[in-house]
């Protein structure tokens, strides 16, 4: 028996050693190893909330079949109604930076709509008759210049029999004269029709807002149009003018927060210069020059470069290799730092022709890639991303609602377990009825029993680490985040939670 006992003990020793070695490879091993006593206590509290919340959610509604990986829009309402404890903590959690979000889908739709109502230049049109017996059509919005405002001043109301589909009418006039429910019925229609692209006409009136727990943002902005629309509806706003307005808006937010004693909560925001991937190579050259000129004049505002549009449509990165290699060398010659942050690896199928974009993105030295869904099917490319520190902008909710993958098949846990840098991003949150990152962090928390509060801590820190902040800005961001994290942990341990602010649409 002595020999058997010795062998058993040796097996158990090796087993413990193997588990410890594997745990040391976890992406959050540093956060776990260096956890303070307060953090350890907070982890226990949050884990208890998760377990209790899970039981409540599975028994939440007799009319809804609850299951792992269920669709977000259904689960979202149940989370907000039932799992208020864990959800409340996710709202308060300091999330660091928001590194993937499109400007026209970052703000609350209701906020943008109310803002649009204040401007007489904003007009609306529909492409079919508006009748009480048919589904209401999708509206289109656009700010018109003074001459066109006069031209369309006599347009009949949308609900009138003599309205000609496709004709512009003042948004204010259309709302005030809406026959099917009055202004309230009009509001319900407009807000209910808000989807990807539905707010295109009001996108340039969107105000930058600070989501809970987010101290910094890199916002993808469409620079494809050489002139944009001013407040009076005229298309005379240059890219340079736009950056001046953006800079003023950021400074206004900082000044207001400083006056409230909250200046350490918001580091700032930058723009990722984006253009359509349908442009030819010659046309792209103009935009690459423009991007460099703007970076030279506004070094603290331009963060990186990317293409817009679904990866399957338009040109692959291979088509743009010549201008992109030139751009990379030219930025170096001019002393400019404009990293590539490409949308690649979007389709889950490795047989999709756009899947090859992963190869070009890594060879071009991309700083980040997103959605990166297919990266997990390329072991060599995963290893390259890990070794080179190329972060994946993971958008679990957006990937589901865009039909790219189901929640239960999302490769987030695979990427984390393999050690590939990951940052959580919302992508198009306002299109899905929420804002900020709270739901994205909630999903990361509940997607695996091995995830805990310290896992989220590491993900938040990575959003600063893999941002386009310069060294000084990154230092300030880390310091501000650490301060907020300490307060956050104390709040959990002491039980001092503020009541959740849930209205069914906003976080």
Give each language-model segment a name.
Residues 2-507:
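Metal-cofactor-binding active-site regions of metalloenzymes
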């Amino acid at each position: 028996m002595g020999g058997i006992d010795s062998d058993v003990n040796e097996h158990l020793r090796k087993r413990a050693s193997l588990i410890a070695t594997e745990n040391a490879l976890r992406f959050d091993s540093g956060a776990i190893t260096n956890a303070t006593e307060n953090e350890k206590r907070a982890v226990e509290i949050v884990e208890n909330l998760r377990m209790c919340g899970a039981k409540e959610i599975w028994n939440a509604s007799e009319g809804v079949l609850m299951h792992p990986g269920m669709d977000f829009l259904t689960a979202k309402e149940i989370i907000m109604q039932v799992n208020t404890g864990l959800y409340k903590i996710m709202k308060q959690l300091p999330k660091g930076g928001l590194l993937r979000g499109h400007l026209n889908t970052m703000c609350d739709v209701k906020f943008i709509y109310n803002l649009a109502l204040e401007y007489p230049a904003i007009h609306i049109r529909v492409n079919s008759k508006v009748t009480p017996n048919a589904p209401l059509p999708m509206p289109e919005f656009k700010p018109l210049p003074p001459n066109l405002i006069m031209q369309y001043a006599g347009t009949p109301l949308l609900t009138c029999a003599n309205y000609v589909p496709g004709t512009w009418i003042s948004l204010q006039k259309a709302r005030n004269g809406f026959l099917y429910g009055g202004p309230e019925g009009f509001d319900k229609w407009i807000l209910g029709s808000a989807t990807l692209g539905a707010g295109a006409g009001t996108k340039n009136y969107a105000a930058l807002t600070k989501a809970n727990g987010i101290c910094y943002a890199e916002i993808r902005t469409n620079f494809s149009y050489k002139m944009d629309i001013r407040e009076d509806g005229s298309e005379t706003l240059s890219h340079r003018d736009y950056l001046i307005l953006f800079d003023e808006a950021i400074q206004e937010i900082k000044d207001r927060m400083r006056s409230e004693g909250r200046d350490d909560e918001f580091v700032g925001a930058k723009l990722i210069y984006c253009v359509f991937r349908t442009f030819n190579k010659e046309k792209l050259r103009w935009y690459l020059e423009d991007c460099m000129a703007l970076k030279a004049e506004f070094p603290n505002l331009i963060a990186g470069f990317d293409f817009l549009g679904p990866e399957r449509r338009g040109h692959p990165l291979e088509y743009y290799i010549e201008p992109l290699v030139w751009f990379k060398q030219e930025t170096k010659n001019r002393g400019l730092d404009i990293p590539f942050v490409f949308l690649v690896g979007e389709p889950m199928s490795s047989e999709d022709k756009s899947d090859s974009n992963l190869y070009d993105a890594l060879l071009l030295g991309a700083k980040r890639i997103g959605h990166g869904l297919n990266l997990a099917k390329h072991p060599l490319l995963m290893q390259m991303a890990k070794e080179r520190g190329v972060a994946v902008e993971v958008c679990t909710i957006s990937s589901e609602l865009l039909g790219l993958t189901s929640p239960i098949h999302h490769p987030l846990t695979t990427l984390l377990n393999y050690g590939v840098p990951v940052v959580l991003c919302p992508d198009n949150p306002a299109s899905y009825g929420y804002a900020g990152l709270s739901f994205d962090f909630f999903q990361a928390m509940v997607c695996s029993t091995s995830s805990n509060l310290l896992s989220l801590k590491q993900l938040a820190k990575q959003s600063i680490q893999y941002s386009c902040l310069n060294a000084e800005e990154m230092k300030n961001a880390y310091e501000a985040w650490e301060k907020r994290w300490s307060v956050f942990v104390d709040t959990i341990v002491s039980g001092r939670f503020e009541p959740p602010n849930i209205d069914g649409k906003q976080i």
